[in-house]
């Protein structure tokens, strides 16, 4: 099987979203894990805490994502211990980009979003070749075509926190309505100057939120 075929199979599942405002970053992801047409797990955590001010969403091969999360978490912690200050989110994304690029001939099959708060909210995307980009909003996974349409139609950088969370949840929910590889509730990470707050929405909670 070629690398392109492996990538296509690995990324056939999951919807993750990242949205940045002037005061916070919101990451959101569904909870379903699939293997082909089979639902393997219904309570997967696709938002990984990297530090007290940084988190990452994962799409792709679970083992690859877990290894990269552990490597990044260790690098951030070592930096903080050695330099006695926080690593910037940009530096963390750049480090992860270098790791991915160094393995480009036998790549980690992942799509990642790294969100955090240093001097301001930051949001970066990374692909399996190490390409890194900073944006106001980003989506990954097989449900991304549906999710990005919701965000593009309604995003405003001046949104307050609850509006931002609501938009992220509705974007992921829209994906779950059309993408069979996404579903089973939504996890949300809110990252601002006070740190990371996790929210967990079951399907009933999501429906009440998007259809008040």
Curated annotation (Swiss-Prot):
InterPro entries assigned: Ntn_hydrolases_N, Pept_T1A_Psome_bsu_arc, Pept_T1A_subB, Proteasome_sua/b, Proteasome_suB-type
Cellular localisation: Cytoplasm
GO cellular component assignments: cytoplasm; proteasome core complex, beta-subunit complex
PROSITE patterns on file: PROTEASOME_BETA_2 (PS51476)
Entry keywords, A to Z: Autocatalytic cleavage, Cytoplasm, Hydrolase, Protease, Proteasome, Threonine protease, Zymogen
Any Pfam family the entry gives: Proteasome
Catalytic activity field: Cleavage of peptide bonds with very broad specificity
GO molecular function: threonine-type endopeptidase activity
Keyword Hydrolase: yes
Prodomain positions: 1-13
Biological processes annotated in GO: proteasomal protein catabolic process
Activity control mechanisms: The formation of the proteasomal ATPase PAN-20S proteasome complex, via the docking of the C-termini of PAN into the intersubunit pockets in the alpha-rings, triggers opening of the gate for substrate entry. Interconversion between the open-gate and close-gate conformations leads to a dynamic regulation of the 20S proteasome proteolysis activity.
Active site: 14 (nucleophile)
Top enzyme category: hydrolase
EC number(s) on file: 3.4.25.1
Similarity comment: Belongs to the peptidase T1B family.
PANTHER family linked: ATP-DEPENDENT PROTEASE SUBUNIT HSLV, METALLOPROTEASE TLDD
Subunit structure of this chain's protein: The 20S proteasome core is composed of 14 alpha and 14 beta subunits that assemble into four stacked heptameric rings, resulting in a barrel-shaped structure. The two inner rings, each composed of seven catalytic beta subunits, are sandwiched by two outer rings, each composed of seven alpha subunits. The catalytic chamber with the active sites is on the inside of the barrel. Has a gated structure, the ends of the cylinder being occluded by the N-termini of the alpha-subunits. Is capped at one or both ends by the proteasome regulatory ATPase, PAN.
Known function: Component of the proteasome core, a large protease complex with broad specificity involved in protein degradation.
Protein name listed in UniProt: Proteasome subunit beta 2
Lineage: Archaea, Thermoproteota, Thermoprotei, Desulfurococcales, Desulfurococcaceae
């Amino acid at each position: 099987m070629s690398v392109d075929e492996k990538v296509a199979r690995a990324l056939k599942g999951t919807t993750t979203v990242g949205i940045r405002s002037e005061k916070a970053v919101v990451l959101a992801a569904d909870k379903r894990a699939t293997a082909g047409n089979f639902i393997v797990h219904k309570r997967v955590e696709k938002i990984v805490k990297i530090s007290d001010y940084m988190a990452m969403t994962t799409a792709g091969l679970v083992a690859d994502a877990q290894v990269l999360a552990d490597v990044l978490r260790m690098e951030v912690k070592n930096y903080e211990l050695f330099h006695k200050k926080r690593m910037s989110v940009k530096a963390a994304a750049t480090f992860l980009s270098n790791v991915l690029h160094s393995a480009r001939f036998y790549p980690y099959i992942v799509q990642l979003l790294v969100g955090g708060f240093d001097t301001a909210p930051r949001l970066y995307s990374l692909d399996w070749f190490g390409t890194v980009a900073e944006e106001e909003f980003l989506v990954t996974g097989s449900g991304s075509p549906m999710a990005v349409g919701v965000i593009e139609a309604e995003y405003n950088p001046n949104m307050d926190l609850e509006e931002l969370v609501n938009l992220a949840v509705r974007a992921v929910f829209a994906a779950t309505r059309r993408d069979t590889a996404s579903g089973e509730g939504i996890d949300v990470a809110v990252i601002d100057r006070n740190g990371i707050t996790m929210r967990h929405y079951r399907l009933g909670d999501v429906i009440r939120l998007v259809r008040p």
